[in-house]
């Protein structure tokens, strides 16, 4: 069967199924029809685990989500294979930024690759990137000072993590803007999935362009290594085994996408939360030691990744007693779990002094815990400290337009955040 016909049938079938499930009020139908995952959680909060007629389980329960995320018996790979090989022209020779990376690999193989990547993301190494982050932040804020009114996403939240992760990986500045465009496309269409043949073609072309560039950089680093992630992975080995080129390219591609997309979302939605809650902004300005906890509360209130999917490797029992068969899939609503009223008092309120904000599940747990979570937190802390230092008159911080969200269910992401503040002499501290 021609690939185009196969993908057309796939999209037609998927759309028809989602429509039917919506009409009968099935949990997966509500999943598709809900504007966001917090709304979905509120529509389905009567029981801790919902079961679709398709056999898929869905949970917004904090305990259920936490225990599944921590368990090595709930796998990422099976669903990823169904997802990314369904409509695509994927072959074993194709390098897929998601399917071939640690996000979609389980067990010993995942641990092997992650172990080789880990030296770049240790607390000591991440701490050394604070100075780089501050340098980039200062450059970005220097441009903002010239006009006062600006789009926070375009001016700060996007370019800061993009520059940091590109420097960590070893991408020459010449290619940063291309990586930005490719990363946004792959995070949007790739993670939320293409809806038609046109989006599928764009996704596959973008994936090929990014992996080709990384392949070229890898070839250069094998001859002339530098102090970056590509060079590290090119030479790293464990138990006498090195990573294959395919493993390196996929791992670097995914690190690039995840490394700036999730941090960008954290920076933008966290700043929006401050603008929408001036009492909390004033409190943060007076007590900047609260910044780390504020970051956790921002992650809780608006999880960058809204949900993840896992598959049981054997008959298992969820935290609420629900039995899952081997091969059964569960959708974990992270955004809903972060608003679970059994765990978080006043779950819809943004409270930077919330004592248990760290219980958020936004970066996951266990084997698939986000390897770059510490880097994201460090970048966020550097950015907000400098923002408050340079622009201490927080009463002048204002929205100047309506924030615009990108379409998509998996990623909570602002497209634009128009704001302004009065430029004044920055504090010395």
List the predicted regions and their residue ranges.
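Cytochrome P450
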Residues: 1-429
């Amino acid at each position: 069967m021609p690939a185009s016909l196969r993908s057309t049938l796939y999209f037609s079938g998927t759309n028809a199924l989602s429509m039917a499930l919506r009409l009968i009020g099935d949990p997966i139908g509500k999943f598709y029809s809900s504007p966001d995952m917090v709304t979905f959680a509120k529509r389905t909060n009567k029981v801790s685990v919902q079961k679709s007629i398709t056999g898929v389980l869905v949970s917004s329960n904090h305990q259920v989500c936490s225990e599944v995320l921590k368990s090595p018996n709930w796998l990422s790979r099976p669903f990823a294979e169904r997802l990314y090989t369904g409509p695509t022209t994927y072959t074993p020779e194709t390098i897929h930024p998601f399917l071939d990376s640690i996000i979609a690999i389980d067990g010993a193989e995942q641990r092997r690759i992650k172990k080789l990547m880990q030296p770049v993301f240790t607390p000591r190494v991440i701490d050394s990137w604070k100075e780089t982050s501050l340098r980039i932040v200062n450059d970005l804020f220097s441009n903002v000072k010239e006009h006062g009114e600006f789009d926070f996403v375009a001016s700060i939240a996007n370019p800061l993590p993009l520059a940091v992760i590109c420097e960590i990986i070893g991408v020459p500045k010449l290619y940063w803007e291309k990586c930005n465009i490719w990363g946004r496309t792959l995070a949007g269409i790739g993670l939320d999935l293409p809806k038609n043949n046109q989006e599928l073609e764009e996704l596959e072309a973008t994936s090929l362009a990014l992996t080709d560039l990384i392949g070229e950089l890898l070839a250069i680093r094998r001859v002339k290594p530098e102090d970056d992630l590509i060079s590290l992975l090119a030479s790293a080995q464990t138990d006498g085994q090195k990573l294959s080129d395919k493993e390196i390219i996929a791992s670097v591609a995914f690190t690039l996408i995840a490394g700036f997309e999730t941090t960008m979302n954290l920076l933008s939605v966290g700043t929006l939360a401050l603008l929408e809650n001036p009492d909390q902004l004033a409190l943060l300005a007076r007590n900047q030691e609260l910044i780390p906890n504020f970051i956790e509360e921002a992650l809780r209130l608006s999880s960058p990744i809204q949900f993840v999917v896992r598959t049981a490797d054997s008959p298992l029992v969820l935290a609420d007693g629900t039995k899952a068969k081997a091969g059964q899939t569960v959708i974990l609503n992270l955004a809903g779990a972060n608003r679970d009223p059994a765990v978080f008092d006043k779950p819809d309120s943004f409270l930077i002094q919330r004592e248990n904000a760290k219980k958020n599940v936004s970066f996951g747990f266990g084997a698939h815990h986000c390897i770059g979570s510490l880097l994201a937190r460090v970048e966020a802390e550097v950015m907000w400290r400098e923002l408050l230092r340079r622009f201490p008159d927080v009463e002048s911080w204002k929205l100047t337009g309506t924030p615009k969200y990108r379409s998509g269910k998996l990623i909570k992401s602002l497209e634009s955040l128009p704001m302004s503040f009065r430029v004044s002499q920055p504090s010395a501290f």
